[in-house]
Every structure is written in structure tokens, then in C-alpha cells.
Amino acid sequence: MMVIVVEGSPPRLRGRLAVWLLEIRAGVYVGDYSRRVREVIWQQVENAIGDGDGDAVIAWTAPTDQGFSFATCGKNRRMPVDFDGLSLVRFAAIPGK
């Protein structure tokens, strides 16, 4: 299973995601695909977000102690950090503070 959450994304990306995944809430997409398909979908998200103002996060089932893995792209204050095999979230400082 995988979950993708997008914010400030181009409408064409949201339409493309809706083709592959179920949009259960505005900007929140879920589905159950193979690793290969998941990587293709995430590549589409990364290409669409690019250097724009949007951001996205993907979480998927993985054989880890936590049972999942995740990745981010775009302008996001939350960045994944590996800490002895555990995925944690580091918050970047707010610019100007």
C-alpha cells in the first residue's frame, strides 16, 4: 500500500494521480501497486513538482522495523533522516526565525 499527499501541486498532477490512485481527500491519494509502478508514479510527482512551490510526500509498506518507508520532494520543512535504521522526521528552521 502507498499514500501520496500533495500540496500546491499543478492541477495536471492531481488529475494524473487520480487516474492511478483513489483520492480519499483533497490532495491525499492511496493505492496498492508494485514497487516498480510506485517508483514510476513517484517519478511523475517529482517531475511535476520540480522547483515550484508545491510539495509532496509518499509513504509505502516496506520490510523495515517500522513497517513503512517514506520520501519527500518539493519545498517541505519535514525531511526524512535515517537514525540507526529508523526513519525519523527532521524539521527545517523557518526562514527568518
What are these model-predicted stretches?
Residues 1-97:
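Basic nucleic-acid-binding interfaces
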